Amino acid sequence: MSGDNSTETGRRRSRGAEASSRKDTLERLKAIRQGGIRSASGGGYDIRLQKPIFDTVDDEEYDALVSRRREEARGFVVEDGEGGDLGYLDEGEEEDWSKPSGPESTDESDDGGRFSGRLKKKKKGKEQTQQPQVKKVNPALKAAATITGEGRLSSMFTSSSFKKVKETDKAQYEGILDEIIAQVTPDESDRKKHTRRKLPGTVPVTIFKNKKLFSVASSMGMKESEPTPSTYEGDSVSMDNELMKEEDMKESEVIPSETMELLGSDIVKEDGSNKIRKTEVKSELGVKEVFTLNATIDMKEKDSALSATAGWKEAMGKVGTENGALLGSSSEGKTEFDLDADGSLRFFILDAYEEAFGASMGTIYLFGKVKMGDTYKSCCVVVKNIQRCVYAIPNDSIFPSHELIMLEQEVKDSRLSPESFRGKLHEMASKLKNEIAQELLQLNVSNFSMAPVKRNYAFERPDVPAGEQYVLKINYSFKDRPLPEDLKGESFSALLGSHTSALEHFILKRKIMGPCWLKISSFSTCSPSEGVSWCKFEVTVQSPKDITILVSEEKVVHPPAVVTAINLKTIVNEKQNISEIVSASVLCFHNAKIDVPMPAPERKRSGILSHFTVVRNPEGTGYPIGWKKEVSDRNSKNGCNVLSIENSERALLNRLFLELNKLDSDILVGHNISGFDLDVLLQRAQACKVQSSMWSKIGRLKRSFMPKLKGNSNYGSGATPGLMSCIAGRLLCDTDLCSRDLLKEVSYSLTDLSKTQLNRDRKEIAPNDIPKMFQSSKTLVELIECGETDAWLSMELMFHLSVLPLTLQLTNISGNLWGKTLQGARAQRIEYYLLHTFHSKKFILPDKISQRMKEIKSSKRRMDYAPEDRNVDELDADLTLENDPSKGSKTKKGPAYAGGLVLEPKRGLYDKYVLLLDFNSLYPSIIQEYNICFTTIPRSEDGVPRLPSSQTPGILPKLMEHLVSIRKSVKLKMKKETGLKYWELDIRQQALKLTANSMYGCLGFSNSRFYAKPLAELITLQGRDILQRTVDLVQNHLNLEVIYGDTDSIMIHSGLDDIEEVKAIKSKVIQEVNKKYRCLKIDCDGIYKRMLLLRKKKYAAVKLQFKDGKPCEDIERKGVDMVRRDWSLLSKEIGDLCLSKILYGGSCEDVVEAIHNELMKIKEEMRNGQVALEKYVITKTLTKPPAAYPDSKSQPHVQVALRMRQRGYKEGFNAKDTVPYIICYEQGNASSASSAGIAERARHPDEVKSEGSRWLVDIDYYLAQQIHPVVSRLCAEIQGTSPERLAECLGLDPSKYRSKSNDATSSDPSTSLLFATSDEERYKSCEPLALTCPSCSTAFNCPSIISSVCASISKKPATPETEESDSTFWLKLHCPKCQQEDSTGIISPAMIANQVKRQIDGFVSMYYKGIMVCEDESCKHTTRSPNFRLLGERERGTVCPNYPNCNGTLLRKYTEADLYKQLSYFCHILDTQCSLEKMDVGVRIQVEKAMTKIRPAVKSAAAITRSSRDRCAYGWMQLTDIVI
């Protein structure tokens, strides 16, 4: 029977001899179960397959078989006998059993009334004998059952076999279904009964010969021993079908009584709000094994008022019926936009786009708003005939300097007219013009113009002279091919601007500083049907000069924007491994203010919010009963179509694109919309062959083909260029990207941000659960509400973070495109800010470095170095290229120059006041202080440039001064404002601060167009010098102690308890430092009452603050908060607890005792399973797609991501996502915790919490790797404890942490050699001298000779040194394990010498391996390949390879001092002379007698040891190092 069960669900057979045989077997089995009869053999059940189940053929035979069947079956149709329309046509194809075809029968002898693809001839006689008498079924229900193959009404909508019926028969079927629905309305209780009835059929049952069962099953609904038939009360019609009766009979007979107990054994015990998962199973031996999760699961009911869905429903309640027309309605009323009195058009620009290739090259498209009465409508401005602007840098012979000076003087003296002067310049440049003309003609450029102009250049190209000079300006159309960027000629040395884009040229020439009002003086309109865009209006401008910035005396307000949030719900196609869309929710905010924040009350105002959802049923499922009525009711209630149903993904996409076009959105919002939703949307449109006239409505440009969607998208760079071109005209606001820029969070998922920022609890739905939600209207409504809620949350997050006004301010300051700012393009913002500034000063702008030029320069760099130089990237100081195209090299480049100065901290716990002083905006202030600019400092290829001698301010200092002065004025206004105006001003000052602080970064960013390494190096050099001079001033002149300094700040230990005296010192220091500088200002950033200083960039302190004149205290952490590291919440909580004890705990003894008690308490709670499971969750961010990790098997979060993606969870496990995991071991297999790697034992929290899970939290791992490193690091400077003691409190083996304790207490081994009080203390960390007996191979440790002799003379008990060794060995030179009378145990002097030499060689070899270990307790990275990155003051090769995740320093695991100490210990063991000199005369005589016998035996070994030690350079001092 078991064998039949294993195969019967996968196939169906017609009646015949096999069916009869199975029936006989079933009856015999029934008799056996009832009468206790056993077969004669007594061996249990005899189960065998008489015939093979499958035929094995190759592809050619299979194709021939299908063709033959199709030919034989041609014209074969089985009619249903009643209507003749429900027959089946056999096409000769094999059935694909991998596809679901409705609920499958588990009875092979009968298909239970199901239509499974082949119509079987049934014999009435057999049916009557096998099946009991049933009531007469309603004809309509019977017809429906024939269609769907199910005796249950709801399966008509979920059975895939229903899809196979011909399209021409739909009308008849719909009539039948309407009749059924009119007669029968099933309720939810019917579904539950039917579900309970079918549950036993889903339980895995394994039959063993000893009748013992081993299984784990869910406890849901397992109390009934017999299935309850489902009955529809309305018509008194029994819906029991043949399948369920026979199936239930068989299973109730086969399953023993103890099995039903087993089915309910997976129980949940609740204690208060916490749940403990307990799984109880029976083993094959009948012994119960109980597995209990060793952590609690929080089961507190969340406040329904804080539910995100509740918040969305509240917001949706504000949408009145009068607003229904807003969604999906076209513009009414006026059809013409407003014009000014002079006929010009006012146009507010939001976005711009240009086609880089094709026929439209050189044409740009501006998208924005025009005023139409009291409203604003979308408009597209097509700008044509934009000209290239290329500058040719002439050789010195073209414009001789002496002639130019004479001509300019004649013009100045009015002896030469300006026209004549220009004519002279043209004559000088004739040769240059002819050469350029020839180059243009070769490119088929027929229309161009050239003119000599005077321009400045001040950037980094060595082939372009710096300063003011005459160059040749070349203008020709963008439709023509560009001149090569590396083109040179006889009369010119370089070309600049040849590849500048038309859009950049237009923005700079027209001085457009971000979104603003433009004035279009001359234009032509076109109808929407003839236009190139989907905007409401479209105008064409033939010359860019017709567009100017609007200068209006009256204040012009910004138009509101239409903001649309999109959320997709997808399922995973497992065969193709792609995401498919099943629902799309759209939320539209019709009047969003873009320049000022919008508080919550204003956002909730009725009439500005609308929503829409379109859903389609997944393949193989249908819509639940009454779904159409539910949709109709929802639409009627809202007064418009807010819910639409479709039958295919293609139809869903078409409807979505149509609705988006009707909304005419300006901004698209979503969480990770640029990384997931937008990509999936367009990929599916492409796969479903959606017409370009439809999918292009996602943007505002009409398109005939889809751009390449995949492109070079770096981590955190937003959407790919292909995706951005598809939505051209609409801005993209990704709240995922924005939150990463504006917030510091552990996780940036929508769920976590909703909780931390909006105080809303979001419900997540797994992609694998979505198809199940189509089984009932209730769950399907839940799915739709979840999609709408997610869209609402992303929009609320955008408003909460004030993303639109902040990015608008940044864009208006910088003058770039708003869409780029929203995508996080910080470098481009600063780039455009400088482009606008230098362009207005008549400077030739630096070109972008193209990929081709990068490869050329990279090849040149590689050729400049010798082949054997493997450290090119580290030695190369000119890091022109950040992304080296040579993929083969994984070597990371070090910094091109030294960074900020970081002083070595004076570690310890300070209980007196500590001052933190820092310079305000150090690097921007240095630029102003020393007049550092492209235009003021001459640069050379080698060396750091000197400070400028010119007092004329450069362009960069002026920019900095301008930004700083504006910010100061804004901050002054903030003091007078409150409420919304204060909020608005605060956003503006933030934007100014971000721009000023980013200015220095562009100088040191190698991919920036304004990259200037000499300037960046000079700025950081001055910063280091300023910090050092400040430290010297404080220490030498003010006699204060500086305990730490970092880049722009210093910490001063006051040594005082009086806060007033500390304030006086603060004022004195600030005054003395600030009077030395003009622009640099130092200020107090904090007063700390108590501070724990651990190491560089790692400290914690109690910060004293004054609010309303009253002091208050708060703990401030830096580098010890463990927010962005792979630490669990438990580690963070224990770290915070230890910090609070240290910083508030009083005396050192009290602090240590409190920490020890807390550690023992938490250990007990963890061992007893009293810690919440959520506290064990570790989070780590994926920096790239999981499949792209080369070392994925050693990365826990990558392994979890890969496993979850295999199960269909695509969202949340991609690059930039934070993956949660718990380190576990399998229940009943505790040995796996030590044998399997960490990555193999990492599990997602949902995997651990799932019912039936066999995973337990690995408590030992969390104690040893999550808690001990954190606590030991925090307590490193606390007297009275040690890593060993902390480990003991946590129940760990203290011996494993002994070396760490020794390292902490004796960082310099020479200290213990010189100042130790005894030999035992001096050599306590050394390895013992171990000798091996040649006879019995026993190894034993040898004490020192002197201690062994003294012990034998005095007859005292063995010292600690000799406890683990034989104290009489040196007197007998005999193996302590061998018999004394046996001569085989004697160890000769040669043996001693050889074994000592071998051990010494091992220590020397260990030293020369050069193993490095990271000093950070939480990292402990071990390597033999040092990282040659330069970082601050650190020595080359000491930076941890895990930087920046780890800021630790690599240290030698076995240092030269360790080797010297070990060799000294061996010398001490074998010493027979020096130790005698320290003894009293009386004792010395006795010892000397014993030594005379031992000395010859160890002489050779002692000589070898001394010789090795003397060769160690550590024991020698070079006189050259101490002689002046």
Swiss-Prot record:
A Pfam family hit: zf-DNA_Pol
Catalysed reactions, semicolon-separated: DNA(n) + a 2'-deoxyribonucleoside 5'-triphosphate = DNA(n+1) + diphosphate
Entry keywords, A to Z: DNA replication, DNA-binding, DNA-directed DNA polymerase, Metal-binding, Nucleotidyltransferase, Nucleus, Transferase, Zinc, Zinc-finger
Keyword DNA-binding: yes
Basic and acidic residues: compositionally biased ranges: 20-30
Family as reported in the entry's similarity comment: Belongs to the DNA polymerase type-B family.
Misc note: In eukaryotes there are five DNA polymerases: alpha, beta, gamma, delta, and epsilon which are responsible for different reactions of DNA synthesis.
Protein name: DNA polymerase alpha catalytic subunit
Gene name, Swiss-Prot/TrEMBL: POLA
